[in-house]
């Protein structure tokens, strides 16, 4: 009789353990993922807004320019501020519908990414400046074929996505310039033009500025160019972009004015007499990169920050120098530098989470290796975040796993391989996506920063893409609506949500 009682007791214990285990497992399995709400209607309304936007009635052209007669000279601790506009508020859309606009954006985005990857590859492989030195004939005009250079990132096909209005010269002539964290050389189109594309403001005439000075071939700034030549003891420069666009001219210095915030003397900038490419009305480019010729280094800025508004909203924000205001609740990350190339701003990224769960990734997948390859850069000119292939696949698969109940859209659209059909919805709950940075801080993305419309009929795609390179790039779609602060004195990146 004892043996049956033992079996009965064993059965009770086993059943109790089974029920306990099952209960714990069911609680774990029933824990819902974290979600965001995507406003489908609002996003689709903005697709119509940007197509119908009339730049002649926007703040870019209806607001009187600030008086440039009173700004004081800038010192390295002075704050400066500029209004920031998105590219698609700058000129009237030539696209028949939002899908064609999207495809155009993605095409030029691919050109830019290819340029960034190529520039870093040249640096990693140790291409010497002497290998790039052009042969120049004293008797010739500006000939682009005489100035060969590696492909570099920048405003290829007008891919500069954000603009500010800057004054150049004395008296200051205002003009719109592309802002680019992936470029160092500042340049504008100049008279006389061997070949100039159309811009919205008159082309700058250096003879109209009392502070304009051509730089000689022996000037220290000339030796800092990746590609330079000499003619009549004037330093010539060339910058080339991913699609074959370029600017060629002489390197000079002049006064640069930031509205009424202040002005800076003797800024080195290219005066481009031969310029080719669709730069969308901008007069040139203001380089915000980490190299010595960038405006940030020339003005000895201790910090700069920007907040990128939604490209489809038609609104503006600001670019601020020397006004760090990081709060305790803001996400921060290490600002890292690549010893092989100083242009780009690398950020310490450790991974992602989807629906509140960390995505499993190999350690050091986002590190810069000993050769200078890999890592993650923060770039305002790249639109869609690119991830090293293994990281992208893991992130995408985690997102797909939590969206099996959502109606799938087209199998792929350009860069995107994960799309949904939200045409019958006004709002939809989607899993959260967050960046996790080295040091433990994280940034939760709004749903509209990772699910974006690609047409005006309700197709939304997961706004990340893989790259065959080991380099990853955090693009401006994921940055929109977040104040990004580059604290150059402390080597910290700050990310403050909803601070535009």
UniProtKB/Swiss-Prot annotation:
Induction: Up-regulated by abscisic acid and drought. Changing residue 180 to N: Loss of protease activity. Loss of protease activity. Disulfide bonds join 190-193, 196-271, 217-235, 222-230, 307-500, 419-461. InterPro entries: Aspartic_peptidase_A1 (IPR001461), Aspartic_peptidase_AS (IPR001969), PEPTIDASE_A1 (IPR033121), Peptidase_aspartic_dom_sf (IPR021109), TAXi_C (IPR032799), TAXi_N (IPR032861). It is an enzyme of class 3 (hydrolase). Its main location: endoplasmic reticulum. The keyword Protease applies. Aspartic protease involved in drought avoidance through abscisic acid signaling. This is Protein ASPARTIC PROTEASE IN GUARD CELL 1.
């Amino acid at each position: 009789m004892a043996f049956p009682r033992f079996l009965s007791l064993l059965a009770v214990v086993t059943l109790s353990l089974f029920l306990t285990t099952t209960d714990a497992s069911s609680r774990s399995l029933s824990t819902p993922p974290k979600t965001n709400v995507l406003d489908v209607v609002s996003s689709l309304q903005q697709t119509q807004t940007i197509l119908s936007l009339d730049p002649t009635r926007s703040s870019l052209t209806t607001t009187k320019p600030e008086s440039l007669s009173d700004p004081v000279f800038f010192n390295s601790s002075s704050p400066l501020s500029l209004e920031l506009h998105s590219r698609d508020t700058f000129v009237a859309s030539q696209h028949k519908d939002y899908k064609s606009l999207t495809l155009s954006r993605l095409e030029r985005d691919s050109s830019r990414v290819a340029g960034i990857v190529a520039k870093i590859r040249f640096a990693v492989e140790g291409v010497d400046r002497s290998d790039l030195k052009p042969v120049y004939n004293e008797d010739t005009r500006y000939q682009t074929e005489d100035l060969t250079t590696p492909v570099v990132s920048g405003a290829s096909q007008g891919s500069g996505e954000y603009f500010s209005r800057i004054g150049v010269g004395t008296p200051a002539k205002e003009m719109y310039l592309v802002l680019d964290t992936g470029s160092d050389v500042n340049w504008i189109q100049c008279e006389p033009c061997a070949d100039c594309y159309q811009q919205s403001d008159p082309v700058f005439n250096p003879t109209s500025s009392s502070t304009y000075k051509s730089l000689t071939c022996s000037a220290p700034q000339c030796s800092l160019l990746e590609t330079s030549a000499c003619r009549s003891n004037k330093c010539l420069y060339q910058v080339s972009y991913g699609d074959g666009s370029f600017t060629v001219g002489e390197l000079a210095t002049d006064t640069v004015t930031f509205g009424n915030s202040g002005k800076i003397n003797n800024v080195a900038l290219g005066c481009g007499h031969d310029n080719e490419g669709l730069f969308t009305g901008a007069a040139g480019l203001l380089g915000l990169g980490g190299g010595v010729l960038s405006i940030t280094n020339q003005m000895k800025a201790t910090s700069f920050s920007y907040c990128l508004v939604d490209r489809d909203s038609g609104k503006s924000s600001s670019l601020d120098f020397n006004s760090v205001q990081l709060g305790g609740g803001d996400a921060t990350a290490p600002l890292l530098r690549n010893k092989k190339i100083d242009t780009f701003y690398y950020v310490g990224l450790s991974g992602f989470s989807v629906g509140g769960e960390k995505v499993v990734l190999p350690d050091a997948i986002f590190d810069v290796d000993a050769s200078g390859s890999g890592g993650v850069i923060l770039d305002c000119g790249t639109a869609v975040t690119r991830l090293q292939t293994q990281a992208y696949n893991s992130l995408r698969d985690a997102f797909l796993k939590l969206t099996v109940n959502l109606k799938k859209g087209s199998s792929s659209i350009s860069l995107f391989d994960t799309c949904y059909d939200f045409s019958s919805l006004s709002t939809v709950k989607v899993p959260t996506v967050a960046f996790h940075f080295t040091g433990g801080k994280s940034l939760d993305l709004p749903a509209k920063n990772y699910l974006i419309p690609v047409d005006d009929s309700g197709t939304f795609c997961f706004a990340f893409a893989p790259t065959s390179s080991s380099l990853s790039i955090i693009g401006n779609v994921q940055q929109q609506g977040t104040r990004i602060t580059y604290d150059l004195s402390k080597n910290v990146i700050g990310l403050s949500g909803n601070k535009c």
